[in-house]
Amino acid sequence: MSFLQKIGAWEHLDTDRAQEYQEMQVWDGETDSRITFDWSADSSPFENLPTVATMTENANLVRGLLSRIAASGDENVSIFSNTTVSSIENGTDHPDGPDLSAWPVLSLAPTGAAQSQPPTRITARLLVGADGINSPVRRFADIATEGWDYNRHGVVATLSLADPDQVAFPIGTRTAYQRFLRSLGGPVALLPLPNNHATLVWSTTVENAAYLKSLSPKAFIAMVNAAFRLPMTDLKYMMRMERPATSASDYEDSHESELTWRLQHTPPASHVPPMVNGVQEGSVASFPLRFRHASTYISPRVALVGDAAHVIHPLAGQGLNLGMGDVASLSKTIEYAVDHGMDIGDILSLERYTAERWAVNAKIGGVCDMVHKLYNVPGQGPVAWGRSLGLEIIDRLPFVKGFLMKNAEG
């Protein structure tokens, strides 16, 4: 958020669609070991807790950035909507003109009713690839990546929550929740949005993801509520429930009634989110979970940022933050080059950027990968005991939690 404020974009976002939260509850679904991330150790008990992080929708962020560009009135900025890059290739050395043989040349083509006709070709002094995991810019620059697929999918949805109990959920405090469900393939997380809404990110096996997406809204809601409240044995049973051969309403009732019955026979769970009571139509989707890291973020006249440079497991929610950190660092690198009369596309100018960001992103991605693997070790032996002990120890060491949160903030 600090970078968005610095560049003047935050004031263009709809702040009614941004939600701060003051703590994050993380616990093991098999041992119930728990850690609470907040700034209580650094604040007065008579004050509201400081913000841990801020959530907003991607659409709100994009609109805010476009609004900031429009408000700048900079005639040197051109935005081409409904336009695709059909190819990227090196330019040519003109005998009577500049040598552009090392400059990227982009061929553009309209994809629909564009507001203005884009140029057919653009020659770039510096081409920034912010074009995702399958980055064409990265392929053009012949930059290799290393990594692997997790054979897991992240199921996402926008949910509505019941009004929180003001005793269990104090006024002025919003909480994010994450429960590790090893037997189901990964953690489930609920991140707060304004007006009693939340974003779901449930990392699970490919089969479980397909099952969840096939459910009716009522059955899906029942499964999400179960994921934060039921013991693992009960949750695994509900994940295997078959569709009955009768009507869809019976199918919906079977999950709801199963959850109701099992909650009646389960000790009440503490520090769980409010009950989910709705799911936004069309919001349930999934995406494959992967780890990727480019061997470098730069080549002559090319720089990579965000998912084009690195993709990590979403369990720490750091994907966008890392990308924003890349953009902030690259901006400073370009500014330094301009101030010192350097060529912004020269590899020597860009080395400052890759030196600042590559190791940071590798460290955070590696930690997320290690935690994912640690919570997917089968059995109840020493590894499970070590996980629980580690959570409990860290929860009792405020300076360690503070260090982890500051690193997560970037």
Regions found by a protein language model. Give the residues of each.
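Conserved N-terminal helical subregion
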Residues: D16-F140, E146-T158
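Conserved N-terminal glycine-rich FAD pyrophosphate-binding loop of Rossmann-like flavoproteins
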Residues: M1-Q5
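Conserved FAD-binding catalytic core of PHBH/FMO-like flavoproteins
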Residues: G112-A113, Q117, L126-P267, Q280-V284, ...
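Short FAD-binding loop at a beta-strand-to-alpha-helix junction that anchors the flavin cofactor
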Residues: S295-L315
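C-terminal helical "tail/cap" subdomain of flavin- and related membrane-associated enzymes
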Residues: K332-G410
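A conserved FAD-binding loop/helix module that cradles the flavin
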Residues: H313-G325
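Active-site flanking residues adjacent to catalytic metal/cofactor-binding acidic residues
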Residues: A130, G306, G325
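Short gly/ser/thr-rich secondary-structure transition/capping motifs
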Residues: S283-R292
